[in-house]
Amino acid sequence: MRTLEAFALSLFLVFLVKWVNSDSSSSPSKDQFLSCMSTHSDSSFINPKSFIHKPDSRVYTDFSQSLISQNYRFLTLNFTSQKPILIVTPRTDTEIQRSLLCSRKLGVKVRTKSGGHDYEGLSYLSLHSPFIILDLVNVRSIEINLADETAWVGAGATIGELYYKIAKSSKIHGFPAGTCPSVGVGGHFSGGGFGAMMRKHGLAADNVVDARFVDANGRIYNSRREMGEDLFWAIRGGGAASFGVVLSWKVKLVRVPEKVTCFRRNLPLTQNMTKIVHRWQQIAAELDDNLFIRVIVSISGGSVQTTFQANYLGGIDKLIPLMNQKFPELGLTFQDCSEMTWIDSIMYFNWKKGQPLETLLDRGQRYNDLYFKAKSDFVKNPIPEIGLEGIWTRFHEVESPIMIMEPLGGKMYEIGETETPFPHRRGNLYNIQYMVKWRLKDIGVMEKHVTWMRLLYRYMRVYVSASPRGAYLNYRDLDLGMNRGVNTSFEDAKLWGFRYFGSNFKRLAIVKGKIDPTNFFRNEQSVPPLIV
């Protein structure tokens, strides 16, 4: 394990980019790219200069700085890799198609960005150059169809924009995606998509019913029927960036009650916190499917505290008796609870009361101006109290550690582990997201916090899933292993692939071998092609 961690860190030190200092002016590819795009122009094709941004443009500079600010850890490492030769912000299918064809013709790598929330920056940074960023920010139309209770969502939209559009169309519909509104649907849906309604309705990916997609040859598939069930299966949880570019998703809307109930209850360590968290582990995945209670562990006032944060698809009058019967240890009261609409519950999870609904349209990254490192786990058996106490002790060693524990069960147990690439279903009690944040730009401070995270992860190994130790793709972690260029073998990639996908990884690699046998769409943790 130490060898793997040292290898990951050593690669990390030459990975990604300190954009403010790097220079790609020596690369001839940007002018060749523009020439290629112009050559492919036709009457329906807008002047490529209107959506292709060179390093000397204001759009490029502002875009680069905004992306780096999503995790300043990349700046602390003083990376020396090349910055993108161009940033492409297409508006149409044709512009996306032509961008891919020219990239392939010129040997230029592609990084496809939806919301830019990849924890390791793989949607906008690259170890290898030259590369472009294909930013789908202008591909975010949303069409709600209440007649058949579906929506077509452009891959560049955020889940906040989707929630907003649903709320403006209906008071009795919602969608089971994440609680962070600025996350892009392109990555969120294609990696699975946890959310507060997943116990009732499953992951976001479980509710995708169709898609439009373009492959490395520029071929556009306008439906799942055209692309085939294998590819459609792969992009709903297997990370679409390994296979091509999703243009849009068709999702199934779900019915929500006119009133839902939320609560947020803080418990300091002195108030029997350990025993209550231990009890939560035993019951959270077995509760009524309408009830989602997650636990957030953090430091407050120099001491460890937990926040029990919940969303119940129903009224207070039904929630309180349920809690008294199943989880009386928490001591929930009417005063702790608030009834609201489903869309207001999304606001409740993110902002203080009184924020306008339009706040959901803010595409800004929630972790702006922070440095952070994250990891994930899945827990199959309750962690004993002594194990929890070991976590609390370690939380006092750094300034801003966070651990979010989200329960599975319900619909998550009804869906088989091979129905989508996301395999972490029945048998898993809850997922853990670990994160440590800091603000000081200093290599020593960065090393301290990243080392702390890795030591906590090592400590947790006896309490979590094993063989393989599960991980969640949308909480990407390059410590698990990385590809070594275009020729990474399936056997080498299994090191990290089985962590994310279990036995589904082989099927993903076979699909990759059919749709992208030359491995054009690749990054440091993309699925390698397996030709059979």
Swiss-Prot record:
Disulfide bond residue pairs: 36-102
Cofactor binding note from Swiss-Prot or TrEMBL: Binds 1 FAD per subunit in a bicovalent manner.
Post-translational modification note: The FAD cofactor is bound via a bicovalent 6-S-cysteinyl, 8alpha-N1-histidyl FAD linkage.
Location of cross-link 6-(S-cysteinyl)-8alpha-(pros-histidyl)-FAD (His-Cys): 117-180
Any one GO molecular function term: FAD binding
Entry's EC annotation: 1.1.1.-
Signal peptide: 1-22
Subcellular location(s) of the protein: Secreted, Cell wall
Listed name of the protein: Berberine bridge enzyme-like 23
Organism: Arabidopsis thaliana
